[in-house]
């Protein structure tokens, strides 16, 4: 069982669109991070690369659902929308 340093709402994170990663300041001076893909996969733990602390990310999992299929334009195929 993991021991979380804190529980933080996703709205309190900074989002980097280029890397599709959410960041939150860690007490050690670095940043906790979690990717959009991690959230889509149901992950809720953000880690710090510089220390052993982890935090639980509080978010609405329905906003990060991956796997919805949509018709592909001009094709007889379906695409997965993420």
From Swiss-Prot:
Compartment(s) of residence: Cytoplasm; Nucleus
| Residues involved in Fe cation binding | 26, 28, 48, 51
The pathway noted for it is: Protein modification; peptidyl-diphthamide biosynthesis
Pfam family membership, one:
Zn_ribbon_CSL
Locate the DPH-type MB domain: which residues? 4-60
User: PROSITE patterns given for it?
Assistant: DPH_MB (PS51074)
From the UniProt record, give one GO term of the biological process aspect.
positive regulation of binding
Q: Which GO terms describe its cellular component?
A: cytoplasm; cytosol; nucleoplasm; nucleus; protein-containing complex
Q: Which UniProt keywords apply?
A: Cytoplasm, Iron, Metal-binding, Nucleus
Record InterPro entries = DPH3/4-like, DPH_MB_dom, DPH_MB_sf
Q: Which reaction does this chain catalyze?
A: [3Fe-4S](1+)-[protein] + Fe(2+)-[Dph3] = [3Fe-4S](0)-[protein] + Fe(3+)-[Dph3]; 2 [3Fe-4S](0)-[protein] + 2 Fe(2+)-[Dph3] + NADH = 2 [4Fe-4S](1+)-[protein] + 2 [Dph3] + NAD(+) + H(+)
Q: Name the coenzymes or cofactors required.
A: Fe(2+)
Name the family the entry cites. Belongs to the DPH3 family.
Subunit architecture: Component of the 2-(3-amino-3-carboxypropyl)histidine synthase complex composed of DPH1, DPH2, DPH3 and a NADH-dependent reductase. Interacts with SERGEF.
Summary of the function given for this chain in its UniProt record: Required for the first step of diphthamide biosynthesis, a post-translational modification of histidine which occurs in elongation factor 2. DPH1 and DPH2 transfer a 3-amino-3-carboxypropyl (ACP) group from S-adenosyl-L-methionine (SAM) to a histidine residue, the reaction is assisted by a reduction system comprising DPH3 and a NADH-dependent reductase. Acts as an electron donor to reduce the Fe-S cluster in DPH1-DPH2 keeping the [4Fe-4S] clusters in the active and reduced state.
Q: What does the entry note on its domains? A: The DPH-type metal-binding (MB) domain can also bind zinc. However, iron is the physiological binding partner as zinc binding impairs the protein electron donor function.
Annotated protein name in UniProt: Diphthamide biosynthesis protein 3
Q: Which organism is it from?
A: Homo sapiens
**Gene encoding it?**
DPH3
């Amino acid at each position: 069982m993991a021991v979380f340093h804190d529980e933080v709402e996703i709205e309190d994170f900074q989002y980097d669109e280029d890397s599709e990663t959410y960041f939150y300041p860690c007490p050690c001076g670095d940043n906790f991070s979690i990717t959009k893909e991690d959230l889509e996969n149901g992950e809720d733990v953000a880690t710090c690369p510089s220390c052993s602390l982890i935090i639980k990310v509080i978010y609405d999992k329905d906003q990060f659902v991956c796997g919805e299929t949509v018709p592909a334009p001009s094709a007889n195929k379906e695409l997965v929308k993420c």
